[in-house]
Amino acid sequence: MTARPDDPTGSLLATLAEAGQPERLYKALEEATRSLVGHKLFTLLYVDGQDVARVYSSRPAEYPISGRKTMGETPWGELVLKRRQPFLGRDRQGIRWAFFDHVLIESMGLGSVINIPVLYDGQAIGTMNLLDVEHHYADADVAPVARLAPLLIPAFLEARAAARATDRNQIR
């Protein structure tokens, strides 16, 4: 397979071999997705039961790392986490349908979203999330971002394992 000139997959794969993981990969994905389709907010969340837990945010003041949302039993959770389908919200109505924190999202000037499930062993283990101004994203923007999602599998498995180890240690 020959990489297209605008396909960052090769350089991102090389990033995985570098020291400083997973933060180095997260930052590289933030930059790659900004170049591909643009965004004003980029977050990464891994699945932990009915919750999603944030491991990366391009705007940590508003969306801090380690923040959590209960999303499993929502229409968005049904679509993205259970049915393992990307979500494209083109406008504020889509944002309001998907997220209980839509007021904060809208206050940041954001009105469109792409959520890509990160899939492993038949399950969604996390999501890659890009937000921008209303009507910024179109159908054609989903596939280039989705191609990058498998790069997050090792980092999300590690984050989930670390969270479970912490939970076990707290029970003792």
Model regions and ranges:
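Short hydrophobic/aromatic beta-strand element in the GNAT-like acyltransferase core
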Residues: 41, 102, 115, 127
